[in-house]
């Protein structure tokens, strides 16, 4: 059954490649197992309206779905389907042979399109990398500044902490004020970097749209949707990253303020705060903020990689022989695989319809 599903996916990819390969209809005519039917379909395409062509293709897809149902669940289990040939092994071998021929003919075209789209998406990742690198550098720089501005170890501060209750309480209250002041300042400083990241995503994704259009197997409408979806997803993730950095700063402010407040309360009760302990606590909280924020930026970078890889599969699927060829179909359960296959078939129709409107019907008129 996996062979049948793979055969269907190979034909699906073949139609997607047809938008950029003018000779596809000739190939389909030569390699189809039912040449007389293809000849009739080609003759009808010369006179049918596009809506009639869609009805015909949808009927063919419906027939294929019924054929898949007759063969049983994708797991390969189930009773022998009625009404089919008495030689299922022969049928399976025939499908495998046809699939091998499809692979051999389509591999170069699909591999080239997949590679070209991949290069353009890799270019997008390279263009966005400076934004995340700059953000990490800013985090490190601001942490260093906060560490200097919130220092409580020095000859003057040490004497203050050990000089008496009023002196110690005054120093710790001043520390609370500095925590609020400087974390608020850092909070504001991150806004321009977040805005530059969002703006950069929008600009570079639009550049990607223009550069990938000549190589994508998808229709222009589907290409636009994919690019817009990518831009929206990355923008939302960038905004979420900025919100998490702000939350990290708020948490840092609250923790340091609470710690300084607790120290001031202890000083009122006669306990002399340890300057070294205070300094170490501030440093540990700042390093925790730096570590957590770096992890969140790294997660955002991985999300860029994942989203662009998904777009590459949508716009230019790898050839059938590629290890990444439809793994979600082969690993999914029956209902999920059928749902994903149906979505692929709907994308297929849109690509074919777009190609025909752009002059694809003229291919059928060639002798």
Swiss-Prot record:
Its main location: secreted. The modification Phosphoserine is found at residue 56. It comes from the Eukaryota. Residues 1-20 form the signal peptide. It is found in: Secreted; Early endosome; Late endosome; Golgi apparatus, trans-Golgi network. One of its GO terms (biological process) is lipoprotein metabolic process. Interacts with GPIHBP1. Interacts with SORL1; this interaction leads to APOA5 internalization and sorting either to lysosomes and degradation, or to the trans-Golgi network. Transmembrane segments: none annotated. Keywords: Chylomicron, Coiled coil, Endosome, Golgi apparatus, HDL, Lipid transport, Phosphoprotein, Secreted, Signal, Transport, VLDL. Minor apolipoprotein mainly associated with HDL and to a lesser extent with VLDL. May also be associated with chylomicrons. Important determinant of plasma triglyceride (TG) levels by both being a potent stimulator of apo-CII lipoprotein lipase (LPL) TG hydrolysis and an inhibitor of the hepatic VLDL-TG production rate (without affecting the VLDL-apoB production rate). Activates poorly lecithin:cholesterol acyltransferase (LCAT) and does not enhance efflux of cholesterol from macrophages. Binds heparin. GO terms for molecular function: cholesterol transfer activity; phosphatidylcholine-sterol O-acyltransferase activator activity; phospholipid binding. The keyword Aminoacyl-tRNA synthetase does not apply. GO terms for cellular component: chylomicron; early endosome; extracellular vesicle; Golgi apparatus; high-density lipoprotein particle; late endosome; very-low-density lipoprotein particle. Gene3D superfamilies: Apolipoprotein (1.20.120.20). This is Apolipoprotein A-V. Pfam families: Apolipoprotein (PF01442). Belongs to the apolipoprotein A1/A4/E family. The keyword Signal applies.
